[in-house]
């Protein structure tokens, strides 16, 4: 029997290369919680606006979180990967600054 190059093929020889099966261990990304903190100056409507626009919350969800912020001093906006959480914190801080509100937004490792 001949192979594609015309050389004799020895069927008794095993020319197969055995590649060991490697398991790649994918790690789940670390998650971060994003919080808003209450202050005496930021209007409740602005907090709802932030939650709807930057965290994609419904009006009802945003209102519920805003009331948590108002009554408890802090409210959780969501849980995200590091990059997403960091971007949301930056967006909220910039928006608050542009609108002259002292609203504080932070992220914390879960």
From Swiss-Prot:
Pfam family, one: ClpS
Any Gene Ontology biological process: protein catabolic process
Subunit note: Binds to the N-terminal domain of the chaperone ClpA.
HAMAP family, A to Z: ClpS (MF_00302)
Task performed by this protein: Involved in the modulation of the specificity of the ClpAP-mediated ATP-dependent protein degradation.
Family: Belongs to the ClpS family.
NCBIfam families according to UniProt: PRK00033.1-5
Name of the protein in its database record: ATP-dependent Clp protease adapter protein ClpS
Gene source species: Bartonella quintana (strain Toulouse) (Rochalimaea quintana)
């Amino acid at each position: 029997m001949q192979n594609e190059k015309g050389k004799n093929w020895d069927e008794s020889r095993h020319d197969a290369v055995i590649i060991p099966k490697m398991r790649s261990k994918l790690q789940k990304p670390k998650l971060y919680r994003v919080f808003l903190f209450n202050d005496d100056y930021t209007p409740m409507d602005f907090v709802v606006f932030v939650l709807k626009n930057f965290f994609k919350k419904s009006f009802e969800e945003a209102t519920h979180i805003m009331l948590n912020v108002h009554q408890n001093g802090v409210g959780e906006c969501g849980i995200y990967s590091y990059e997403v959480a960091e971007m949301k914190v930056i967006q909220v801080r910039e928006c608050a600054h542009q609108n002259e509100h002292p609203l504080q937004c932070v992220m914390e490792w879960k």
